[in-house]
């Protein structure tokens, strides 16, 4: 099953992904976290589910690529993020990707591994930007992809809903609640 989580920035997509990755077994991949100094966001780091970390983007390190005020570090994205996705594709049952967004899409290696992941039989939970980007739209419109929009009203219930849908699809819970 392929699950995409979308929503406005700051609504809690990464928090939801982190909770799901803790609750679900045999998962691999990565999520992103803010880097803050003096209460201000100055960048993002990549954190793999097995604990490896790298810099995705910062405002104060002049990497060659830029998205808004952030300089994007494709080296760490590819050596840490993409490598974790490739490993998860080989060895895990569930692949976590946070996120399929503007910064990550600068990397052709990232786009390639995302295509492989969505072509695979593996379960996937990914966050994805709201966008008219052709790559993003192609991923969202694939057969078998379920898109959940996270917002303030459903952020407490969506965790349970995603767990239920994933487990039901795996055949782990065939009780629909209907008598």
UniProtKB/Swiss-Prot annotation:
Q: Which EC number(s) does UniProt give?
A: 3.6.1.15
| Assigned keywords, A-Z | ATP-binding, Hydrolase, Nucleotide-binding
Query: Which SMART domains is this protein grouped with?
Result: AAA
* Catalytic reaction equation(s): a ribonucleoside 5'-triphosphate + H2O = a ribonucleoside 5'-diphosphate + phosphate + H(+)
Entry's family note: Belongs to the THEP1 NTPase family.
Fetch the NCBIfam families from UniProt: PRK13695.1
Q: Supply the name of the protein.
A: Nucleoside-triphosphatase THEP1
């Amino acid at each position: 099953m392929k699950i995409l989580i979308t929503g406005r920035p700051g609504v809690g997509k990464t928090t939801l992904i982190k909770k799901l990755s803790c609750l679900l077994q045999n998962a691999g991949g990565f999520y992103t976290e803010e880097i803050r100094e003096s209460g201000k966001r100055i960048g993002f780091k990549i954190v793999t589910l097995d604990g490896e970390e790298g810099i995705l983007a910062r405002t104060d390190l002049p990497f060659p690529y830029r998205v808004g005020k952030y300089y994007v570090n494709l080296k760490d994205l590819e050596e840490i993020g993409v490598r974790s996705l490739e490993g998860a594709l080989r060895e895990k049952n569930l692949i976590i990707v946070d996120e399929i967004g503007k910064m990550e899409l600068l990397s052709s290696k990232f786009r390639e591994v995302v295509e492989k992941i969505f072509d695979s039989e593996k379960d996937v939970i990914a966050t994805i930007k709201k966008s008219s980007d052709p790559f993003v739209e192609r991923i969202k419109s694939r057969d078998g992809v379920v898109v959940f929009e996270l917002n303030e009203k459903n952020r407490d219930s969506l965790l349970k809903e995603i767990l239920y849908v994933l487990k039901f699809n795996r055949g782990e819970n065939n009780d629909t609640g209907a008598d």
